[in-house]
Design a protein with these regions (language model features):
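Transmembrane beta-barrel domains of bacterial outer-membrane proteins
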Residues: 63-80, 86-92
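Short, acidic/polar
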Residues: 58-61
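Outer-membrane beta-barrel transmembrane domain signature
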Residues: 25-56, 67, 84, 95, ...
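Cleavable N-terminal export/targeting peptides
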Residues: 1-31
Length: 201
């Protein structure tokens, strides 16, 4: 383990502010984009922790993506909770490669469908920094923003999380990922998720 790199990654994890598309499908990846010409499918269950007297809520998300270049990919998918469904899509650009960290920026959109309140959609913005602390292990920190209720009759609000996570490379075709979303706005909720990603060409 390289001490300077590990220290720099740890600082990024502590300093990264965030707001949350992560509460619907999660970030659940490092800053590296999908390899050019490759497909990816990811499945991850989520546990969202209620605030105060609120119940905890469980859900499951699935995303599929494609690497268009060595630095750019796109993903889309769904998340299902009890009485609530999210449909989401995003595009990610790998800004810095191993300098000494990997850094990416992603923008996206999501739509919420529910029988419990009004449907709405929002815009997502995610900043990621990650780095290898071993041959197969990466740690990452995310700034994940969701601007909710835009272009609708509902009140606008923003959900924000700090999102530290780990990604373990089983082999060239499989990654295991886990993260904890730390809510930093009143509208956000802490969450825990872990999942598996498969890659193929």
């Amino acid at each position: 383990m390289h001490t300077p790199r590990a220290l720099l990654i740890a600082i990024c994890l502590l300093m990264a502010p965030a707001a949350a598309f992560a509460q619907d499908v999660g970030i659940v990846e490092s800053a590296e984009t999908i390899n050019k010409g490759n497909f990816k499918i990811r499945v991850n269950p989520l546990l969202v922790f209620g605030k105060g007297a609120e119940d905890n809520t469980g859900g499951i998300a699935a995303m599929i993506g494609y690497g268009f270049t060595s630095r750019f990919d796109m993903e889309g998918g769904v998340a299902f909770y009890d009485g609530l469904t999210f449909v989401a899509a995003n595009a990610e650009f790998w800004v810095l490669k191993e300098a000494p960290l990997d850094v990416s920026v992603a923008g996206g959109w999501h739509q919420r469908f529910t029988d419990q309140s009004d449907d709405y959609h929002g815009i997502d913005l995610t900043f990621l920094a990650s780095g290898h602390v071993g041959k197969r292990l990466e740690i990452y920190g995310g700034l994940d923003l969701a601007f909710e209720g835009l272009f609708s009759d509902t009140d606008n609000f923003t959900k924000a999380h700090i999102v530290p996570g780990v990604e373990f490379k089983v082999n060239d075709a499989i990654d295991l990922v886990a993260e904890f979303g730390i809510a930093i706005t009143d509208a956000a909720r802490h969450y825990l998720t872990g999942g598996i990603a498969f890659y193929w060409k």
